[in-house]
């Protein structure tokens, strides 16, 4: 029997390949960062060829460094940065423009046009999403409108659109397969998550030819096999795909309605499983597809926070008050509190539950006694405050009061942040033994499709807690601090508009 599953984890800043064994333990990994392009203020792009180059490179590298043969790989699972939009030429396989990244705000104007056309309620009710530049739909329109000859080629059926999963599967199979999974499709703002099909009315409003779109498949099924030239002659099933946040929900074994996880990465993303029920949000959350597995499609509520770990990168790269992200834990604990300082990291607007494309970052409450450590501490605290904003909306929408929150992602190794998170939520925070849950979720989805794991019960039994953080902060103090945060956010909202 084959011994391993390979997860390809194509993130916003790096491409990773991780090998997991039958126990769900990591046996090897390889990672490579790639270039971020910022052609104008608020614009973010990647080079699709570099995405593919780094992703295929780390896949080969992890096999070399572990000495594991392609013959021992039972399947490949893919997880990816969602919403990021790639359009390529069907005949040459070459992109016609850079990938427009989920963080990119250039299509805010197209979103305003959709609202002016009265499409907002329709989109909300049928895709589960808000009209925002974050999602793929307006990015596709922008490329078709701005790349010379693109619209004509698209109408002639010569162009293909895909989120990153589609682009990787297309390249792994050398152009034989053009598919996506339910979870990724549900983030395009083009997919009707009630009827489970591409939405003609939205495609028409954005003037996007249906022939460009990938076929939507289950999150756990064999889509195709690696081409012989991709992996030195190997024929490995590509058997699972899910957007990064849905993959993390699966990797955390949140299989029952009401179970939730928060992933702390570049942004922060909290998802709650709502089972086979489309739960509309009245509180600025998204309703999204969690996954399609075992012939069933399940839904989730999601709160997307645009800037979390990215704020720590900003402290390091732009303000240069830390050398690396790990320093923040020590420096934050060198001061007793944030000295009344609040950081609102709205560098690319505010996500859930505010959805304000025109909010901008702010540091408030500064006095002459404010030190670098206070700003560092306030930056970490901002991640926890934003999480509370989302959790309150989620409890309101679902009618479920959360007893504990499962956490994952890079920043969960920061004990200060995790303890403050438990304190400000007033809820137990569970950090699992394996924090690579995004890649693990992709591995589980692929493994289920090829019989490497029996069923979801077997997977649920593998989930083990590493550390439990229990709330210790006194209630009056907690609420006072949170009120201060809400005041700070209100100052940052709609900032850009005030110029006009």
Curated annotation (Swiss-Prot):
Write out the residues that bind ATP. Answer: 12-14, 266, 309, 313, 410
- Purpose: Key enzyme in the regulation of glycerol uptake and metabolism. Catalyzes the phosphorylation of glycerol to yield sn-glycerol 3-phosphate.
EC number(s) reported in the record: 2.7.1.30
The UniProt keywords, alphabetically, are:
ATP-binding, Glycerol metabolism, Kinase, Nucleotide-binding, Transferase
From the UniProt record, report the name of the gene that encodes this protein: glpK
User: Which species?
Assistant: Alkaliphilus metalliredigens (strain QYMF)
Put simply, this protein is called Glycerol kinase
Under Gene3D superfamilies, the record lists: 3.30.420.40
Organism phylogeny: Bacteria, Bacillati, Bacillota, Clostridia, Peptostreptococcales
Please state the pathway this protein functions in, per its UniProt record. Polyol metabolism; glycerol degradation via glycerol kinase pathway; sn-glycerol 3-phosphate from glycerol: step 1/1
């Amino acid at each position: 029997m084959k011994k391993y599953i390979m997860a390809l984890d194509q993130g916003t800043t790096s491409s990773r390949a991780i090998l997991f064994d039958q126990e769900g333990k990591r046996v090897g990994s390889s990672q490579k960062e790639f270039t971020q392009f910022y052609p104008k203020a608020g614009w973010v792009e990647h080079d699709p060829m570099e995405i593919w180059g780094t992703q295929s490179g780390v896949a080969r590298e992890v096999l070399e460094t572990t000495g594991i043969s392609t013959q021992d790989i039972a399947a490949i699972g893919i997880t990816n940065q969602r919403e990021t939009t790639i359009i390529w030429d069907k005949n040459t396989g070459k992109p016609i423009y850079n990938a427009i990244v989920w963080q990119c705000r250039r299509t805010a104007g197209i979103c305003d046009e959709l609202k002016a056309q009265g499409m907002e309620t329709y989109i909300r009710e049928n895709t589960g999403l808000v009209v925002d530049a974050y999602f793929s739909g307006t990015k596709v329109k922008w490329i078709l409108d701005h790349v010379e000859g693109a619209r004509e080629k698209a109408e002639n059926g010569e162009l293909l659109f895909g989120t990153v999963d589609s682009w990787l599967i297309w390249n792994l199979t050398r152009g034989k397969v053009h598919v996506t999974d339910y979870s990724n499709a549900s983030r395009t703002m083009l997919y009707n998550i009630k009827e489970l099909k591409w939405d003609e009315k939205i495609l028409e409003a954005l003037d996007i030819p249906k022939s460009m779109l990938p076929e939507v498949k289950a999150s756990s099924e064999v889509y195709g096999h690696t081409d012989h030239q991709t992996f030195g002659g190997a024929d490995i099933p590509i058997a699972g795909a899910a957007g990064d946040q849905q993959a993390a929900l699966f990797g955390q074994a949140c299989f029952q309605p009401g179970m939730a996880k928060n992933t702390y990465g570049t942004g922060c993303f909290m998802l709650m499983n709502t089972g086979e029920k489309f739960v509309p949000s009245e509180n600025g959350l998204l309703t999204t597809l969690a996954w399609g597995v075992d012939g069933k499609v399940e839904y989730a509520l999601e709160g997307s926070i645009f800037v979390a770990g990215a704020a720590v990168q900003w402290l390091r790269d732009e303000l240069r008050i830390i050398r690396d992200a790990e320093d923040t834990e020590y420096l934050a604990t060198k001061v007793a509190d944030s000295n009344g300082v609040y950081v609102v990291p709205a560098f690319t607007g505010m996500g859930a539950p505010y959805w304000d494309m025109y909010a901008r970052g702010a540091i408030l409450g500064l006095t002459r006694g404010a030190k670098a450590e206070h700003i560092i501490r306030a930056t970490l605290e901002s991640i926890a405050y934003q999480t509370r904003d989302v959790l309150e909306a989620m409890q309101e929408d679902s009618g479920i009061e959360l007893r504990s929150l499962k956490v994952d992602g890079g920043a969960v190794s920061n004990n200060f942040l995790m303890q403050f998170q438990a304190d400000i939520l007033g809820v137990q925070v569970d950090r699992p033994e394996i924090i690579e849950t995004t890649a693990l979720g992709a591995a589980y989805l692929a493994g289920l499709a090829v019989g490497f794991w029996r069923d979801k019960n077997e997977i649920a039994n593998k989930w083990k807690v590493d550390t439990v953080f229990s709330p210790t902060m006194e209630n009056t103090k907690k609420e006072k601090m949170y009120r201060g945060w809400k005041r700070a956010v209100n100052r940052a909202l709609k900032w850009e508009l005030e110029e006009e």
